[in-house]
Each structure stands twice: as C-alpha cells, then as structure tokens.
Design a protein with these regions (language model features):
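Nucleotidyltransferase catalytic core that binds NTPs
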Residues: 1-223
Length: 223
C-alpha cells in the first residue's frame, strides 16, 4: 500500500496546494493520501495573527473537500510542542508496517532537509516527492535530489513545477487589499471573510456575487 503524506501550515490553504497534490497523486498513484496541518511548524515562525489550530484544520478540510480520495488528518494538532515530521512518520509506520510512505516537500524544505529533526531516520522511512514552484526552481530540486541520493541513499522523486506558483505568504499579503480570492477555493475564501482572518477585506466582485441571490431582479442592474 502506498501512503502519500502532505503536511504543512496551510496558512491559508490555497489552490497551489491542491494543484500540487493532484500532480503528486498523478505521478505516484497512492492508495491513501493524508493532508496533515501542523500545529507548530519546526522550520519557521507562525505569522502573528495566524488562525487557531482548529480554524486551520477547518480551512484545510474545506480546501481539499472536492479532492477525491484525500483525507485531512488532525494527528499533529493534538501534540504539544513542535510538529516534527519524523514523529508523524513513525506513528504512521507503526500502524502500517508494510506501507510505502511518500512525503511531499517543496523546494525550500528539500534544500534544507539536513536541518530537519532526525532527518536521517526520516530518509530511511520515506520516499521524498519534491515539487518546484517554477521551472527555475526545478533545476535546483533536481540538483539537491541527486545530492541526497548520493550522500544518504535517499529515495527522491523530483517533479516538474507546480501548476499554480503562489504561496500562502502571497495570499496573506493580498487579502487585506481586497485581492487574492482567485487563489482560494470559494468555501475557504468565504470562511476567511466571514471570520475576518488575516485582516482580509472582501473582494467587491465576491460581494456582488453574494448579494445577487438576495436581490429582486429589478434591483440587480443597480448593484
């Protein structure tokens, strides 16, 4: 059995995340796909004002709800302290001793992999699936993948650039400017606006779309 593990802060989850996971699943054809939001990322500080873990979990579930065969897991949200991937992998390995585990990583995570907690043990347990956001990054992914293979005997699959080159940082920057809705699933964007997350201000076109069903036909031309 193949298990694909896609972890991250998903702060917020955007269409680049879902597009990337589709590319991974098409390449490795996993039997089970787990999307796992982390509680406290070990490699970076959470942005001030980030949603509570329960809010992040809900947004992630909304983002991936239309992806068949994808399960969103809260296994890291119940742990105290930082969310170390090696702990998650060990937990999954204990429950699935014969499974092939595939861990999805982006360019930044791949090139700093030697800084991960207990990274050698992690490399022994998983096949890395490395994704670049741009064609320029893909060359770097290929180079570092080769380095990990030669140095540690790592199993690494390097995939082409993600179809939607956007980051959560980009989305957080755009939302207070009434922009960025095009990078989010409609349900995720609606939740962000309704809960006033990230200092978001509603996109005016989105507001019009929300208002139309509540207006009488003769009023729509004036909106």
């Amino acid at each position: 059995m193949k298990i694909c593990i896609y972890g991250g802060s998903f702060n917020p989850p955007h269409l680049g995340h879902t597009a990337a996971l589709r590319a991974v699943r098409a390449a490795i054809e996993p039997d089970v796909t787990l999307v796992i939001p982390d509680r406290i990322p070990p490699h970076k500080e959470l942005t001030p004002g980030s949603p509570e873990p329960s809010e992040s979990l809900l947004m992630t579930m909304l983002a991936f709800s239309s992806e068949p065969g994808v399960e969103v897991s809260d296994m890291e949200l119940h742990r105290s302290g930082k969310s170390y991937t090696v702990d998650t992998v060990r937990e999954l390995r204990d429950c699935n001793p014969d499974a092939e585990l595939y861990l999805v990583v982006g360019t930044d995570m791949l090139t700093t992999f030697e800084q991960w907690h207990d990274y050698r043990a992690l490399l022994a347990q998983v096949t890395l699936v490395a994704l670049a956001r741009t064609s320029d990054e893909h060359a770097e992914v290929e180079r570092f993948s080769a380095y990990l293979r030669q140095t540690y005997g790592a199993r690494v699959i390097a995939l082409p650039a993600e179809p939607i080159p956007v980051t959560s940082t980009d989305v957080r920057r755009l939302l207070p400017q009434r922009r960025g809705s095009e990078y989010l699933a409609p349900d995720v964007y609606a939740h962000i606006i309704q809960q006033r997350l990230y200092g978001a201000r509603p996109d005016l076109n989105w507001l019009r779309e929300q208002a139309y069903p509540m207006l009488k036909p003769r009023r729509i031309s004036h909106v």
